[in-house]
């Protein structure tokens, strides 16, 4: 692995919001996982805060409507997961594009789960404009909640297996 990618986070209509580099640590037909550093200062996301220097292990699935970022402090302590409900990503050469649908899920190692930005999701009016995308987003939210509740990858560290190995490696189906 070790390939550098540029990640392009786009809004729900495909317009780029931000971009940054990451290093691929796993890649197969199901998706890819990359490592990136948070460089945007402190940001309170609900159940935890993102801090300058935090490491993200970002898992993107090519056929799922969500992605998951395992967030660790600069010292390696697991803060939790930030999950984006999003259209499946597009890999174009060394560029990864994903369209954020605003709805997010925050999960902490103790198992607490918080849905955030549901007001922004409703404001997109996907239920009226794109009923299929709306249904996929709600299904993705339920899928992530079930995976977290079952301590299944990429949330296996909820079982207390904090050995430092990447939870997103071995993407599976």
Which ranges hold each PLM region?
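Extended soluble regions of mature proteins
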Residues: 59, 68, 79, 95-101, ...
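A short, polar/proline- and glycine-enriched secondary-structure boundary/capping micro-motif
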Residues: 43-49, 93-94, 124-128
């Amino acid at each position: 692995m070790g390939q550098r990618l540029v990640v392009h986070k786009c809004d729900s209509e495909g317009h780029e919001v931000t971009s940054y580099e990451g290093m691929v640590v796993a890649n197969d037909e199901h998706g890819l996982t990359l490592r990136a550093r948070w460089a945007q200062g402190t940001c309170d996301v609900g159940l935890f805060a993102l801090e300058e220097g935090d490491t993200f292990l970002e898992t993107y699935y090519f056929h799922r409507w969500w992605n998951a970022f395992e967030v660790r402090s600069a010292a390696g302590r697991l803060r939790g997961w930030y999950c984006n409900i999003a259209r499946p990503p597009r890999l174009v050469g060394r560029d990864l594009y994903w369209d954020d649908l605003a709805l997010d899920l925050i999960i902490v190692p103790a198992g607490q789960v918080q849905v955030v930005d549901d007001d922004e999701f409703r404001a997109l009016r996907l239920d009226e404009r794109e009923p299929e995308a709306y249904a996929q987003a709600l299904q993705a939210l339920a899928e992530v909640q079930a995976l977290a509740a079952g301590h299944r990858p990429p949330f296996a560290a909820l079982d207390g297996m904090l050995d430092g190995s990447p939870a997103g490696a071995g993407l599976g189906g």
